[in-house]
């Protein structure tokens, strides 16, 4: 959704009739037919013996929805031949649940878009249903939301794995740390207390994600904190089997040894680039810490700054060596600030590292696709704080990534488009 002032959408205006607000209910597909939300679908014949059903009893169900609490008169049916019981189906309500599916969906949007924990998602739901479902409002509790999240994960998993998104031939892979585990339960199982130092090492996991330039997330793998090459091979193999041979032309990652080794084994013929965006960011940070803005950097220091950036972006060993020699000359001939001396020390560290990658055939890449994705994902994960089990984290990731693939950009030239829509618009 776009930001700032927008004109009022008059198509969404509600009418007031006899002191009541009239809200037209949306229609949803049930078995390839459209039905108004919360309408009743009654069974007619037994699914076992095909006999016509008889009414057994009447029952009024109260459904908690984002529109308020809705009462629906339903019937229970019985087969006269085999005594099998049936009941009416309320469109938009799964089984005998007290909450409607759309209410659960809105709570999930609150959780992911609002970067909320399960408990905070419940509190927000209570706020926007004040006077509708209860005096203080009522929303699915943390346990109900968690259970709904686990069920929804199977749908999200299929969406993610069946996603047929076109791209420009370049894929981006990176990992980020998340916290997981239940300390008290683990201590009980091993019959001893775990120190804080041990717990910090034990509770971290890494979520490795593969995405396109359009920020469409294709797949992920949860590994140990510092994974081996073998831990990432299943993820890359799934991606290799998903696309025709020759479709993937380049893979971009950071200097992670596990990624480099796994890519070399699974994609030996594909060009592998290493992302230098974070190197550029680290250099810039040293200057921003001292001068706060590029405009405030003295001319001598600007020369050093530009030369270090050229060094980082160098795509040949010769050009990289030339840039490094220029930096050393500037260091010896010019009066420089502390920021420049810190930046030059950092440049000396990364020079040898980048040369080693260039010798192996790697090329530098300045695209910050994965940094943008993980800055968003990391914000959600930090505030979710609900990962007691690995299966819970896996299901959360399936839901989160499927949600972000369909979530529209709020800023930039692609505002109003989701990553999937952007990919379809660009590549058809």
Name what the model sees in each region:
Residues 2-3, 10-11, 15-16, 25-28, ...:
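Extended amphipathic alpha-helical interaction segments
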Residues 2-3, 55, 78, 85, ...:
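RNase H-like nuclease fold core
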Residues 21-35, 56-67:
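Short Cys/His-rich Zn2+-coordinating modules
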Residues 32-43, 67-73:
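Short, flexible, mixed-charge glycine/proline-rich loop motifs
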Residues 47-48, 81:
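Short, cysteine/histidine-rich loop/knuckle motifs that typically chelate Zn2+
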Residues 53-113:
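Basic, short loop/linker segments at the boundary and entry of helix-turn-helix/winged-helix-like folds
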Residues 79, 107, 121, 125, ...:
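Short, conserved catalytic/metal-binding motifs centered on acidic residues
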Residues 87-126, 130, 134-136, 141, ...:
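Extended interfacial segments that mediate partner engagement and assembly in macromolecular machines
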